[in-house]
């Protein structure tokens, strides 16, 4: 178990926000420790971005590099939706490591703050399909599971754009509140038709014949200098792609 105050990694994405300020995204949360293999050891860790400052000072010690870099965390902003999100119930997915039932994938802060937080837990998806296909797809913007990767700041500095591996998704969030402003419709061939809490099952050709490769979604995100166009980069070719 990790304390809620544990910062963890911030290396999924880094975006310049002016001056000495940067926006950093951590991954979907801790899953390196055995927790529950039926949800890929993911937890209800709330997706977020960090605001940090990076200060350079001259190194006068006479050894080492010419400058010292001092990072300072100034804010952590949790990502949420004003509309209802799909969370897993935990039914049929076994127990937590302490033997208690896995339970809902909804973060407990949802009730406290009367909102709907995005989370890294892998079963946080629903059956409703926003694309109108016969089956649910991973592009459903109502799914709560969100694995932040690339990040860019809008030209006016008021919002951030974050790409993800689960959908893949590209969402726009208010930089102050963390509430989602918009979910962009991406090409349909990037999504998978059948979602599972276990990534290895999702990736079986018997389950999905096309779409993003598990854990290799929209890893990178760029924005043009005029701020009008986002450029997303997939970590790997989509499944069964004819070229690599």
Q: What does each model-identified segment do?
A:
Residues 1-244:
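Sequence/structural signature of beta-propeller domains
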């Amino acid at each position: 178990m990790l304390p809620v105050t544990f910062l963890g990694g911030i290396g999924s994405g880094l975006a310049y926000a002016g001056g000495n300020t940067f926006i950093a995204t951590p991954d979907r949360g801790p899953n390196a420790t055995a927790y529950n293999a039926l949800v890929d050891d993911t937890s209800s860790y709330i997706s977020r971005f960090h605001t940090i400052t990076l200060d350079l000072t001259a190194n006068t010690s006479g050894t080492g590099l010419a400058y010292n870099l001092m990072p300072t965390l100034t804010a952590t902003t949790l990502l949420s939706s004003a509309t209802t999100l799909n969370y897993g119930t935990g039914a049929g997915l076994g127990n937590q490591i302490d033997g208690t039932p896995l339970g809902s994938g909804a973060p407990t802060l949802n009730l406290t703050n009367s909102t709907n937080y995005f989370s890294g837990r892998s079963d946080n998806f629903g059956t409703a399909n926003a694309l109108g296909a016969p089956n649910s797809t991973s592009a459903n913007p109502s799914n709560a599971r969100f694995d932040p990767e690339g990040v860019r700041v809008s030209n006016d500095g008021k919002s951030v754009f974050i790409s993800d591996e689960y959908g893949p998704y590209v969402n726009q969030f208010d930089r102050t509140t963390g509430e989602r402003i918009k979910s962009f419709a991406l090409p349909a061939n990037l999504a998978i038709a059948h979602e599972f809490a276990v990534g290895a099952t999702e990736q079986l050709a018997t389950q999905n014949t096309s779409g993003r490769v598990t854990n290799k979604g929209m890893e990178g995100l760029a924005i043009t200098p005029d701020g009008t166009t986002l450029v997303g980069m997939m970590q790997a070719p989509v499944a069964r792609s004819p070229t690599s």
